[in-house]
Amino acid sequence: MTQTKKANSYVPTIAPKTISQTRQDIKNYTDAKNMFLNADNPKRYPWYNLLDTIIVDLHLQSQINNRMLKTLSQPFLIKDLKGNLDQDLTSLLQNEKFIYQVNKAILQTVYYGHSLGEFDYVNGRLVFNLIPRQNVDPVNGYIFKDYTDDKKIEYRLQKEYGSWLIEFGNNKDFGLLDGCVPHVLFKRFAQSCYSELCEIYGIPPRVLKTNTQDRTMVARGEKMLKDMGSAAWFIIDENETFEFAQGVSTNGDVYKNLMQFCNNELSMGISGAVVGQDTKNGSNGKEKTSIGILQDLIDSDLSLIEQTWNTTIIPALKVLGVVTKDAVYTYPPAEDLDKLWKMTTEADKFKNIEVDPVWIKDTFGIEVKEVKPQSASGTKLNIEDYERFFV
């Protein structure tokens, strides 16, 4: 692959920042969103810092990975403008690391709204590095080396823009994670309450009635209750009484229901349906429908990648010298392999029809060998052939 020279790099100039791991609530969510939408001086770093804290939710991660990884694993094809497969260029790009990095940045625009990154060479191999979203203002076209500072670079006016430096997505879009933030915050609240309930469940409150006007007796009573622990005995004054109050009567269903509701909403937002592991009383038909809805979203993601490659990536790679001719990035059409296999086996039963073994291997991954015709000496007589046998 021909290596061209690059004038400026932007990722190494970004100042690293320590993100405070404080507890987030709905107020943080609304404040960050208001700063994002500020018309005079928009600041995006509080919003993306908030997304970095909620994206660690395991259920949310699993839903995003189910959709994104299935899209990234799809094989692609490079064709010329006439629709003919360019096998050499396809094989070359399939072995390049930057393909995965670029496609991931494109897909992340579905969840984050926007991605800005740059190509670079590392040990002679082309890579694609994402510029932290906290440091980018795509509405005005700015890159901030320090997102808390006002010093900026107008990246769309740089000569690297459109070749080394490329962007995807919508400048004003919050992405799908916007609707996920409240449910992750509610879920964390429910988890915290449920954890606290587990600590005190089954432990009844202890009540000591004493003379509150006597500070000595109050202090002695407090010390006794603190030191009592799980002991089965204690000493009190004859004027004091000790008893157990009514303990916790709930088993935490209200918290579990809230967590389940939040998980279901996260599944609906990312996958378009509540799939298998999230349902208690599902059915085969429902699961097939849910998987079909998820597949529709994956097909939409594949279409997004195709459009971005053909309008943005390939023109940039032509400037860099990676692609030297007109090309089209595409995915093979989706096929129902179960239905196709059934049709193939039925077609093979017809006389004078032969299914290509090479096509079977490429489509289904099955090694097929042609059956050698039996020799005349190995042919067995059939009673139905008696008319031809007797002369």
Give the role of each language-model region.
Residues 59-62, 244-246:
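Positively charged, small/polar-rich N-terminal and surface patches that mediate targeting and assembly
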Residues 73-80, 86, 243, 247, ...:
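Charge-rich, low-complexity amphipathic helices
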Residues 99, 107, 261-391:
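C-terminal helix-loop subdomains that flank or include functional centers
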Residues 2-50, 74-228, 233, 237-238, ...:
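Structured, contiguous alpha/beta core segments that scaffold functional sites
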Residues 126-129, 216-220, 243-247, 335-344:
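Short, solvent-exposed polar/charged micro-motifs at secondary-structure junctions
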Residues 187, 191-311, 315:
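A contiguous, surface-oriented mixed alpha/beta subdomain in the mid-to-C-terminal portion of proteins
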